[in-house]
């Protein structure tokens, strides 16, 4: 499974984004890392970063995204505004696993003020190893979720 992964953060998640970006670039499962910001001296509000990342997935230009803000909540809420995107905030192994295997979530969000860096790095490594099975019992539930999205023209 070769993945194109988008990374993004606001200023409250910049340090973790940079560390995770380095880990992703060194991981053989990742073929491309796309950084949508912020830069070291930038101050872009998290909704803009999260939506930019989610749109790349929705447009087929990336497979997954890893987003960081202070809590991980704002980036998840923002990314979920993009049709077809399922973003979660998860700070434990079981939730990370189930986010992919049960919910086919493409976006994993962390809170830099909530979870330690080493745990975030470990969870990101684990997350890369999970792949949704479209023939699983969960597939019908994911389709039901998608059915609640407004039709796009």
UniProtKB/Swiss-Prot annotation:
Tell me which residues this entry annotates as catalytic.
69
Q: Which family does it belong to?
A: Belongs to the LacAB/RpiB family.
Question: If researchers knock out this gene, what phenotype do they report?
Answer: Cells lacking both derI1 and derI2 are totally unable to grow on D-threitol or on erythritol.
Q: Name one Pfam family in it.
A: LacAB_rpiB
Which EC class heads this enzyme's classification?
A: isomerase
* Catalyses which reaction(s): D-erythrulose 4-phosphate = D-erythrose 4-phosphate
The disulfide bridges present are none
List the induction conditions.
Answer: Up-regulated during growth on erythritol, D-threitol or L-threitol relative to growth on glycerol.
Q: An example of a Gene Ontology BP annotation on this entry?
A: carbohydrate utilization
Q: Please give the name of this protein.
A: D-erythrulose-4-phosphate isomerase 1
PANTHER family per UniProt: RIBOSE 5-PHOSPHATE ISOMERASE (PTHR43732:SF1), RIBOSE 5-PHOSPHATE ISOMERASE-RELATED (PTHR43732)
Q: Where are the transmembrane segments?
A: none
UniProt keyword annotations, A-Z: Carbohydrate metabolism, Isomerase
- Associated pathway: Carbohydrate metabolism; erythritol degradation; Carbohydrate metabolism; D-threitol degradation
Q: Which NCBIfam families match?
A: PRK05571.1, RPI_actino, rpiB_lacA_lacB
What domain of life does the native source organism fall in?
Answer: Bacteria
**What is the role of the protein in this entry?**
Catalyzes the isomerization of D-erythrulose-4P to D-erythrose-4P. Involved in the degradation pathways of erythritol and D-threitol, that allow M.smegmatis to grow on these compounds as the sole carbon source.
Catalytic activity, EC: 5.3.1.34
Q: Name one GO molecular function term.
A: intramolecular oxidoreductase activity, interconverting aldoses and ketoses
Q: Which residues form the signal peptide?
A: none
Q: Which InterPro entries match?
A: Rib-5-P_Isoase_Actino, RpiB_LacA_LacB, RpiB_LacA_LacB_sf, SPI_LacAB/RpiB
Q: Which organism is it from?
A: Mycolicibacterium smegmatis (strain ATCC 700084 / mc(2)155)
